[in-house]
Amino acid sequence: MSTEDKLQGLGLTLPTPPQPAGAYVRAKKTGNLIFVAGQLPLVAGDLKYIGRIGDDLSIEDGYEAAKICALNVLSILAAEAGSLDNIAQLVR
């Protein structure tokens, strides 16, 4: 079972990798490493959440924003590596 299949089993779908929101590259592959730029909670190019947790956003909104960012990172890694199955390890 592929990593993408496991994600689908959890009810998660990888989005299309987001385009950079500025003058930078979203990822850079160097040898066997892939460096990914910081992420915003973008859904189909639109910023889904704006504000601070506790002031403008609830804790649940924060969890959802983090989930969107994580899925965006995974989609970028899948695009760069050809498949998430080609990723051996994530490093913070």
Where in the sequence are the language-model features?
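Short, polar/acidic, helix-capping and beta-turn segments at strand->helix junctions
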Residues: 1-92
